[in-house]
UniProtKB/Swiss-Prot annotation:
Belongs to the cytochrome P450 family. SUPFAM superfamilies: Cytochrome P450. It comes from Aspergillus brasiliensis (strain CBS 101740 / IMI 381727 / IBT 21946). It catalyses: 2 fonsecin B + NADPH + O2 + H(+) = bifonsecin B + NADP(+) + 2 H2O; 2 rubrofusarin B + NADPH + O2 + 3 H(+) = nigerone + NADP(+) + 2 H2O. Glycans are attached at residues 113, 348, 386. This is Cytochrome P450 monooxygenase bfoB.
Length: 489
């Protein structure tokens, strides 16, 4: 009986603390979020993470308590405070979802996931310089080659009236391109199928660690990330669910394409005398590039065509601009495409309206800081969701409309700082310029070679896709008719 009284007393004490004494008790949010991370678990399992973030902020305001020790912000100033250079002193990824997942998967030695400032100090100039060199020398050639080979393999345009899965085509040439630039080889389709689970496994694992955060500090879970992962695997095994591992997966470097990131990193590290940077670290960073090109860009390239095909007036304007850029597809160099304002506006608008990265993976952990006048105690997680910022009426005119024209004119009605898909500060994506190059070439070449007609017009991105930590299942089916009798492959 005494034990029951003690348990009841503890529960009452917890209830009083969470409701009245907790430093976050005054922050608005769902009632259950004061006790359990119900928001995150529900968002991840329903596949509506970005839509739910937006709904929460529309309901509760610019700062929302989404868990017992987690806040979500929806302002540009919060974005600057958390992710900017000054934020590096006040916030860390150690103990965040990203930190725990990277430790569990063995990718914590990558530039984006490293928690040590010394590691990032060594890796950033190494990776940034090699990416820039690769972009200048071979990345453009690889973009053309990967797309051309897949157009030929799919016989795109051979029958102008037969619909094709444009999204599947995009997946396959991005997989080839990812392996070319990262490891110097062509990625086989069988390898792509085995790689896909590595993209999807973090979402259910993150739900599990969110539950652990109720009972243990974030730093403790970070320290025992591999143990937490093994426990999660055991639970899934008992429940007869797949136990696909997060192991670091590589494809042997057969150097079909000698100019690749892995080889350049090894040469640059040797030249700089960085003997303490292991080959495993270089492999991990090369794998991260492969994941970035295939595992995140797949959604973005599909989203570009999803919105263009649903807005024929935008597609028509883009066609006119691209077709006037050269007399043949071979003339569509990135130097030329970078000067096409509407092409770049279409890409930027897609980044705004349908960003690849969301608040679920952009989480940081406070070291004790104030954000937008709200004190965030040490150990409390914070996030700013790109989708919510990109769809905010506070920063955009007609935020739900796909309107590339907004990027061609300066206006007080649009705050462009509310769309920064590659982050800012010391953890800004080092492959930003390569990503723009890739999108320009791939989108422009397809638009130049084919007129397109959407087939699956009833597909809805909000209703029919699954948006966890990785936005997936965006399907675009179209009829591609060659503009000339001579196909571009």
């Amino acid at each position: 009986m005494l034990a029951l009284y003690l348990i009841a007393g503890l529960l009452v004490g917890l209830l009083v603390y969470r409701l009245h004494l907790d430093p976050l008790s005054h922050i608005p949010g769902p009632f259950l979020a004061k006790f359990i991370p119900i928001c995150n678990i529900r968002m991840l399992h329903t596949g509506r993470i970005v839509f739910t973030f937006r709904e929460l902020h529309d309901t509760y305001g610019p700062v929302v308590r989404i868990g017992p020790s987690e806040l979500s912000f929806a302002t540009v100033t919060a974005f600057d405070s958390i992710y900017g250079f000054e934020g590096e002193k006040k916030f860390t990824i150690y103990g965040s979802r990203r930190g725990v997942v990277s430790s569990a998967s063995g990718t914590d030695e990558s530039l984006g996931n490293a928690t040590s400032k010394e590691s990032r100090r060594k890796l950033r100039p190494l990776i940034t310089s090699t990416l820039n060199e690769l972009m200048a020398s071979s990345a453009e050639e690889y973009c053309h080659l990967a797309l051309t080979e897949q157009l030929a393999a799919h016989r795109v345009g051979q029958d102008g009236s037969t619909p094709i899965s444009l999204s599947t085509l995009n997946y396959r040439y991005l997989w080839q391109l990812a392996n070319m630039v990262a490891f110097g080889n062509r990625g086989q389709e069988a390898h792509r199928e085995t790689f896909n689970p590595h993209i999807r496994w973090p979402s259910p694992f993150v739900s599990f660690i969110d539950l652990l955060f109720i009972f243990c500090s974030r730093a403790t879970i970070q320290q025992h990330a591999r143990t937490a992962y093994k426990a999660w695997q055991a639970i899934r095994f008992v429940c007869r669910q797949t136990t696909q591992g997060p192991q670091v997966d590589f494809i042997a470097d057969d150097s079909t394409f000698p100019d690749n990131l892995h080889r350049r990193l090894r040469q640059a590290a040797e030249k700089a005398g960085l003997d303490d940077v292991s080959d495993f670290t270089l492999l991990v960073n090369s794998m991260i590039l492969r994941f970035s090109v295939y595992g995140t860009s797949d959604h973005m390239i599909n989203a570009v065509f999803y919105y263009l095909l649903r807005h024929p007036q935008c597609l028509k304007r883009l066609e006119k601009e691209v077709l006037n850029a050269g007399t043949s597809v071979e003339e569509l160099s990135d130097n030329r495409l970078a000067k096409l304002p509407y092409l770049n506006a279409c890409i930027n608008e897609t980044f705004r309206i349908s960003p690849a990265f969301n608040g679920g993976i952009l989480q940081r952990v406070s070291c004790g800081a104030t954000v937008d006048g709200v004190y965030v105690p040490p150990g409390v997680a914070v996030t700013v969701d790109n989708y919510t910022l990109g769809r905010s009426k506070q920063y955009w005119e007609n935020p739900d409309a796909f309107c590339p024209e907004r990027w061609l004119e300066s206006s007080d009605k649009n705050v462009f700082k509310a769309s920064r898909p590659f982050l800012i500060g010391s953890r800004q994506c080092p492959g930003r310029q390569m990503a723009y190059q890739m999108f320009r070439i791939l989108v422009a070449k397809l638009v130049y070679l084919y007129s397109m007609e959407l087939v699956n017009k009833d597909f809805d991105i909000e209703r029919d896709t699954f948006c966890g930590l990785h936005w997936a299942d965006l399907e675009v089916d179209a009829i591609l008719k060659p503009r000339t009798d001579v196909l571009g492959y």
